[in-house]
């Protein structure tokens, strides 16, 4: 569907102009109605699409006349004189600015046909400048395969260990199983033709379209396959002409922050040709093309609206689909493949989409292939050709008007009112195809037999002749290839290489991506501003913690800690870029497939677009920090500080981007990122100075970019400076003692001097030298360039992981025989089973006796302060053994009525009577009814049988024994025909149950609850293909036969589906009733009502559901002057309904209540007692964890690697001053796994909560207290296991156990250390639950938790001791849980043992004359501790400031005797977290209506 083709190479003027003729009519569509896209009502500009503008009120299309007209005009156009006369009358639409021109897409009189006619005439003036570019396609013996396994086992914590061999086989490629997806396809789609691809989900439609478009990611063509793109070989098409054949996937991925106008203008600019019309700039061209496409697709009114997505508000889903269509249109591809692009659209909009495609092919000569799962007859008739797929076999390819006859001649029967598309697809389902009498043994049955019948037919032979003729006309590598290359070259920028698939130059690609990048930033400026403000606040907090540091030696440690913090915060400010890159990756890959730009061009642009933010952030953060803390206040050092912090930011940004681009999934990126960050922090040079790094690990420091930045910042602060020793640090501090006999206690001090030189301090403490400062800058630049190169390379060549094809997963040991055949050859037996078992199961299905009826139901809510009525006096009833359809236009209130009747609304005012057997509903009503939601919400780790059992145990009455409930579940499984996959895992779409199996399970979960009153179903067939919809209706039929009362909403069913309902409740806009009553045989009762009241007669072939919408004026393009809700209110039918309701109320209320089980529990809100609720929830959540080995193993791997990394980095730390500091930092660094553990816990909780709140809470399965308690308790055993892992991997390598040996308390202190680690992990998990309890998104909860975690770390007493904290912040030191945790672990780990100085830590001072060192220092040692290395020396004393580790502990306000108290305080924090989590959930998430009840 190439609109760009109209001016570029893609034209066939003869076909295009001829197809429209001279009349101002609709573009003709074979067999269909005039397209609603031409010449519309000017007053309805925003709602009419341009398809409305090309011709209303036109006569029906006569195909023969049109073909004659095409021939006549084609002959005219071959004559040059005629061509020039057409051309000379043409105007240039790009330069047309008149408001009322029919060529102005923004004007009220725009006509797409006139615009196209002018454009075609213009391009025909100069065919060399605008050469034709067409790409029809022929294929012979097309076979495609992939690798994988048809069935797999679900992984859990135990059997994951058994996967090591499988992993090895996967890596070596020896374990691959070849799976044939497509077998021997043949076909021909010429330029200007449309092909519809029909088949059930899983039949190979998507693979076929991807193959045609050259998207061979994970799939492979067999060697014998021949593809001919009008002379171009498949490899050349994929490589050199990638954007000329495109695949439009079912999903709509766009940048949500961009407006629709900006999104489409970008697409137009990236494919803007070099050879434009004279005087038309690139900007004019792109803007005009965008406006034309938006006008044609009815998007003009959304030009400034954000595209949005599931989380960002923007245009509607239908409009977003049209944005995808417009983007593909603007790509200008002559061959387009559309995969189920009508999903989610009603039949009217689907038809409009098909007609749009038809218009494009007829005018622009594009080649289009479309897969549609539900096609109305009108939509089907738009296409030229059809191919039918059956489990990877092609069973037909040919003209759409010949397909039905091909199969009816073979012996199959098409039921009355079944559309041709449904008939063709039904042939691939053994349970649905109907064989004519006398043909039972003659017709094909299996896919292979169907394929053989097709191959042996005359239609196939004719197709092969056409393909051979086409291939002779366009031989591979023939003249047409050169013409195509020349036409591409006419489009490409001058400096773009000939073999490139891209249109604009690399410079232009980067420029356009940059413009778009700034538009995205503008569209989401709040995020950027919040990040800047957040970093500024963090700078203020840290600046206040280290506020106005003294310029003396007492600030040495604080300055080091401050610079360490500063360089880390700058370095890791880009860590979130990993998430950002993953969010945009599908969009970039899609647009690269459209050949809009190189992925690396977007990568360069995104870096450049981030620069203003990074520079602004660096200035704001670093200036605030620098001047608040009194760092070196000289111009030179200040700018050097800014330079190095910014270069660190940029270098680490490149590193994080490389990680993101090099991995195929987010989880692959996050685990190495977590370990990498830990390593970068430890080996920066502050936590372990370089002189203390172990020889085998020193290389990590060399590979740490942050280490070079930290060294330069330290040198920048201390080089060439002189620091006065504070009076408290002069040793000994005797009054009257001479300075010559004193020394400053700081490393680098010289005896007899009250000053310490910064260079001496750096050299002796860290082995840092001034000569390294600028060398380090060069090294950092080298790192930056290296990571930049790897990032750009990875971006260009590594694509995102693609999902596997549909496979069933089973629990190990529960594999069902024949399960692999569930979707293949066992269909017949599965159908027979359903029919056989239904009678047996009927005895178990509870036959409902109660009648649910309602009268005058109204529902009012306030929207923006204005009252609005959603439902308006709705009456009706549902009786046992009947199925009532609830229909209406979009927005009529169908789902709202279901929610109101099912007591599921939590806001607004509901009035009217809703009665069960004439009595008001009690609080057990919700659990006594089943409600099948439109979305199939299930826990992905559970099996089908477990999901049903969970529902039965918790929702069936308490007096029913557990065994009876389990037996009933087996009956439900038989009834639903789910035996073959009863032990299959639900999984996620694509890896687990398919769409139909999910829908059956959704219904089964409600049936398992044994609903005593009725079953509500909301859109059970929405988004399903026709065959799956039919099987769901089969199921509903079975249920009604067994006495179930069913009320079911349905959206525009086919005629055959509609006939299967007993009654209809039909709503108009505003929730007003249009009809309630019997449907009747062949819809006669319904049709009679409407016809009597002024509706046109129902045509024999019409779909009553669509006819009904047209009658009331609710279908697109229809209008009604009759007020149908008013007609209903005055009708005798409504009077009869009211009388019957009054009769039901009076007679049923006299019925005696069944007292056999009407004890108190029958009327309780929940069927099961709290203990049963909690037990079942615990079992399910624990099994979810057990069956999510990725979660458990990633948690374990994180704990093991982090603990070992820290343990061996600080291996056997000595009890020297630096060694004790290292041991303190080993505890401090262990705290950093907090953030990663929180990020792992929150998504699991959100998954459980989403299921509970959407399905299980409204159905009263269990209470919110059981839900919260189970989710908190399930973490306990895993945290206990992780605490053992951390204890072993961390405690012993560091050697903390050795400090307990002198006091003979190894066991007691080891046990306490393990308990403290356990309390840390429990605090982490309960804190995560507290943070996420009231918050919707795991990302938001994670960010908030990390912010609070950072504050806890800053104020825990390690980086800034309580003595150095400003008075204002002391409260934070006291409320930080890590204060007590670190203090308890430090005291337990190093207390009550001797300390020994390293050689460099001894202070060398001179005693007074004739005095021994011992005599001189004994008083000081008695007061402050320490020891002398040489007691009797008289010339130079070597003094160590600490002799006991308790001296070190007291310096950081940690005391050995407080260790058990600190453990108790940690438990107080844990209890607080649990209480707060429960309270926050109750406050934020429990609906007001149920707060008093739950």
Swiss-Prot record:
Keywords: ATP-binding, Cell membrane, Glycoprotein, Membrane, Nucleotide-binding, Repeat, Transmembrane, Transmembrane helix, Transport. It is found in: Cell membrane. ATP binds at residues 888-895. It comes from the Eukaryota. Residues 1-48, 84-105 are annotated as: Disordered. Glycans are attached at residues 41, 141, 340, 622, 835, 1410, 1432. Signal peptide: none annotated. The chain crosses the membrane at residues 527-547, 561-581, 636-656, 669-689, 778-798, 1191-1211, 1227-1247, 1276-1296, 1312-1332, 1351-1371, 1463-1483. InterPro entries: AAA+_ATPase (IPR003593), ABC2_TM (IPR013525), ABC_trans_N (IPR029481), ABC_transporter-like_ATP-bd (IPR003439), ABC_transporter-like_CS (IPR017871), ABCG_dom (IPR043926), ABCG_PDR_1 (IPR034001), ABCG_PDR_2 (IPR034003). SUPFAM superfamilies: P-loop containing nucleoside triphosphate hydrolases. SMART domains: AAA. The keyword Signal does not apply. Pleiotropic ABC efflux transporter involved in the basal level of azole susceptibility. Confers resistance to miconazole and clotrimazole. Belongs to the ABC transporter superfamily. ABCG family. PDR (TC 3.A.1.205) subfamily. This is ABC multidrug transporter atrG. The gene is atrG.
């Amino acid at each position: 569907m190439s609109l760009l083709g109209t001016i570029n190479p893609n034209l066939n003027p003869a076909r295009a102009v001829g197809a429209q003729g001279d009349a101002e009519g609709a573009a003709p569509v074979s067999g269909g109605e005039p397209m609603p896209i031409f010449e519309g009502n000017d007053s309805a500009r925003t709602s009419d699409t341009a398809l409305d503008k090309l011709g209303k009120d036109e006569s029906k299309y006569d195909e023969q006349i049109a073909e004659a007209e095409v021939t006549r005009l084609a002959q005219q156009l071959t004559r040059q004189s005629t061509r020039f006369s057409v051309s000379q009358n043409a105007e240039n639409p790009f330069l047309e600015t008149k408001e009322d021109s029919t060529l102005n897409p923004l004007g009220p009189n725009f006509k797409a046909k006139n615009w196209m006619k002018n454009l075609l005439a213009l391009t025909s003036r100069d065919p060399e400048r605008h050469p034709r570019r067409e790409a029809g396609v022929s294929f012979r013996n097309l076979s495609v395969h992939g690798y994988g396994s048809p069935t797999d086992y679900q992984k859990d914590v135990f059997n994951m260990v058994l996967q090591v061999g499988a992993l090895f086989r996967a890596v070596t490629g020896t374990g691959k199983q070849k799976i044939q997806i497509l077998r021997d396809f043949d076909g021909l789609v010429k330029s200007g033709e449309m092909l519809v691809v029909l088949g059930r989900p899983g039949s190979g439609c998507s693979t076929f379209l991807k193959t045609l478009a050259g998207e061979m990611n994970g799939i492979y063509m067999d060697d014998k396959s021949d593809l001919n793109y009008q002379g171009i070989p498949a490899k050349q098409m994929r490589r050199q002409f990638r954007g000329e054949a495109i695949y439009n996937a079912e999903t709509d991925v766009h940048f949500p922050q961009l407006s629709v106008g900006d999104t489409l203008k970008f697409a137009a600019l990236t494919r803007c040709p070099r050879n434009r019309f004279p005087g038309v700039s690139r900007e004019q061209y792109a803007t005009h093309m965008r406006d034309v496409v938006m006008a044609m697709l009815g998007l003009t009114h959304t030009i400034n609206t954000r595209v949005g997505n599931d989380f960002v508000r923007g245009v509607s889903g239908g409009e977003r689909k049209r944005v995808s269509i417009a983007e593909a249109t603007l790509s200008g591809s002559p061959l387009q493949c559309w995969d189920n692009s009508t999903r989610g659209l009603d039949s009217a909009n689907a038809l409009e989409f098909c007609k749009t495609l038809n218009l494009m092919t007829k005018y622009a000569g594009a080649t289009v292939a479309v897969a549609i799962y539900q096609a109305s007859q009108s939509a089907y008739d738009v296409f030229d050709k059809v191919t039918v797929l059956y489990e990877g076999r092609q069973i037909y390819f040919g003209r759409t008007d010949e397909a039905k006859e091909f199969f009816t001649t073979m012996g199959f029967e098409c039921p009355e009112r079944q559309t041709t598309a449904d008939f063709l697809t039904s042939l691939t389902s053994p349970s649905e195809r109907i064989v004519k009498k006398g043909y039972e043994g003659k017709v094909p049955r299996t896919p292979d037999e169907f394929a053989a019948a097709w191959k042996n037919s005359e239609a196939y032979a004719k197709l092969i002749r056409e393909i051979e003729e086409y291939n002779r006309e366009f031989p591979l590598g023939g003249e047409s290839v050169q013409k195509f290359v020349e036409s591409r070259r006419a489009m490409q920028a001058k400096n773009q290489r000939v073999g490139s698939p891209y249109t604009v130059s690399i410079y232009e690609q980067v420029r356009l991506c940059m413009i778009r990048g700034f538009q995205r930033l503008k569209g989401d400026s709040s995020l950027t501003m919040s990040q800047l403000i957040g970093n500024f606040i963090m700078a203020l907090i840290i600046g206040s913690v280290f506020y106005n540091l003294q310029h003396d030696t007492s600030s040495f440690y604080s300055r080091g800690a401050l610079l360490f913090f500063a360089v880390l915060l700058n370095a890791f400010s880009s860590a979130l870029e990993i998430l950002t890159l993953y969010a945009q990756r599908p969009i970039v890959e899609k647009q690269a497939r459209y050949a809009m730009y190189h992925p690396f061009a977007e990568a360069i642009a995104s870096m450049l677009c981030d620069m203003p933010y990074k520079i602004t952030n660096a200035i704001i953060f670093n200036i605030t920090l620098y001047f608040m803390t009194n760092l070196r206040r000289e111009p030179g050092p200040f700018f050097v500080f800014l330079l190095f912090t910014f270069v660190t930011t940029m270098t680490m940004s490149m590193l994080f981007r490389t990680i993101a681009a090099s991995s195929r999934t987010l989880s692959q990126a996050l685990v190495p990122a977590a370990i990498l960050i830990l390593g970068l922090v430890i080996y920066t040079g502050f936590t372990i100075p370089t002189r203390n790094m172990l020889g085998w690990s020193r290389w990590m420091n060399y590979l740490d970019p942050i280490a070079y930045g930290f060294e330069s910042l330290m040198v920048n602060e201390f080089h060439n400076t002189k620091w006065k020793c504070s009076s408290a640090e002069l040793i000994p501090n005797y009054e009257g003692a001479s300075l010559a006999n004193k020394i400053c206690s700081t490393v680098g001090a010289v005896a007899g001097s009250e000053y310490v030189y910064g260079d001496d301090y750096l050299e002796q403490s860290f082995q840092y030298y001034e000569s390294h400062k600028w060398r380090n800058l060069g090294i950092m630049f080298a790192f930056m360039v290296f990571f930049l190169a790897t990032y750009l390379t990875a971006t260009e060549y590594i694509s995102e992981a693609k999902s596997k094809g549909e496979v069933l997963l089973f629990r190990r040991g529960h594999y069902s025989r024949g399960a692999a055949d569930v979707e293949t050859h066992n269909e017949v037996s599965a159908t027979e089973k359903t029919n056989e078992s239904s009678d047996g199961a009927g005895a178990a299905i509870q036959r409902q006796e109660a009648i649910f009826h309602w009268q005058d139901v109204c529902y009012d809510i306030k929207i923006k302060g204005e009252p609005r009525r959603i439902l308006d006096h709705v009456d009706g009833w549902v009786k046992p053994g009947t199925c009532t359809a609830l229909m209406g236009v979009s927005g009529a209130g169908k789902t709202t009525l279901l929610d109101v009747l099912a007591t599921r609304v939590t806001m607004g005012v509901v009035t009217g009577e809703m009665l069960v057997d004439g009595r008001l509903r009690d609080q057990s009503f919700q659990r006594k009814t089943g409600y099948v939601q439109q979305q199939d919400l299930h826990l992905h780790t559970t099996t089908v049988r477990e999901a049903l059992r969970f529902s039965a145990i918790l929702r069936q009455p308490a007096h029913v024994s557990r065994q009876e409930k389990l037996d009933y579940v087996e009956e439900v499984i038989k009834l639903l025909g789910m035996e073959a996959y009863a032990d299959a895992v639900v999984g996620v779409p694509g890896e687990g149950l398919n769409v139909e199996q999910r829908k059956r399970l959704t219904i089964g979960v409600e049936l398992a609850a044994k609903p005593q009153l009725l079953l509500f179903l909301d859109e059970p067939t929405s988004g399903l293909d026709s065959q799956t919809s039919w099987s769901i209706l089969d199921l509903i039929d079975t249920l009604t036969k067994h006495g179930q009362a069913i009320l079911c909403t349905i959206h525009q069913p086919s005629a055959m589906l509609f006939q299967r309902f007993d009654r209809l409740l039909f709503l108009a806009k505003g929730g007003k009733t249009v009809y309630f009553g019997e449907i009747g045989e062949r819809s006669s009762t319904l049709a009679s009502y409407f016809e009597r009241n002024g509706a046109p007669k129902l045509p024999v072939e019409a779909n009553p559901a669509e006819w009904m919408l047209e009658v009331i004026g609710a279908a697109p393009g229809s209008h009604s002057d009759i007020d149908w809700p008013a007609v209903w209110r005055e009708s005798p039918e409504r009077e009869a309904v009211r009388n019957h309701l009054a009769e039901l109320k009076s007679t049923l209320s006299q019925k005696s209540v069944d007292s056999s089980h009407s004890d108190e529990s029958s009327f309780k809100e929940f069927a099961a007692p709290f203990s049963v609720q909690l037990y079942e929830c615990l079992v399910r959540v624990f099994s979810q964890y057990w069956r999510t080995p990725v979660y458990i193993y990633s948690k374990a791997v994180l704990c093991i690697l982090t603990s070992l990394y820290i343990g061996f980095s600080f291996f056997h730390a000595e009890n020297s001053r630096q060694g004790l500091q290292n041991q303190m930092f080993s505890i401090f660094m262990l705290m950093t796994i907090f953030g990663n553990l929180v990020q792992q816990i929150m998504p699991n909780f959100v998954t459980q909560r989403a299921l509970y709140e959407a399905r299980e809470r409204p159905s009263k399965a269990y209470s919110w207290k059981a839900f919260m308690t189970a989710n908190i308790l399930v973490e306990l055993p895993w945290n206990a296991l992780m605490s053992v892992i951390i204890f072993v991997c961390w405690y012993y390598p560091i050697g903390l156990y050795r400090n307990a040996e002198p006091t003979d308390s190894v066991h007691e202190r080891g046990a306490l250390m393990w308990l403290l680690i356990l309390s840390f992990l429990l605090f982490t998990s309960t804190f995560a639950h507290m943070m996420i309890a009231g918050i919707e998104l795991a990302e938001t909860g994670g960010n908030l938790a990390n912010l609070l975690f950072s504050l806890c770390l800053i104020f825990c007493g390690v980086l800034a001791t309580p003595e150095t904290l400003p008075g204002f912040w002391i409260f934070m030191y006291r409320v930080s849980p890590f204060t007590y945790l670190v203090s308890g672990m430090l005291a337990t780990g190093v207390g009550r043992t001797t300390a020994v100085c390293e050689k460099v830590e001894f202070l060398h001072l001179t005693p007074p004359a004739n005095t021994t060192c011992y005599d001189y220092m004994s008083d000081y040692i008695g007061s402050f501790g320490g020891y002398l290395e040489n007691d009797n020396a008289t010339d130079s004393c070597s003094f160590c400031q600490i002799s006991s580790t308790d001296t070190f502990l007291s310096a950081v306000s940690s005391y050995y005797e407080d260790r058990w108290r600190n453990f108790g305080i940690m438990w107080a924090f844990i209890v607080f977290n649990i209480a707060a989590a429960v309270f926050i959930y109750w406050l934020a998430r429990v609906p007001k209506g149920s707060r008093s009840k739950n």
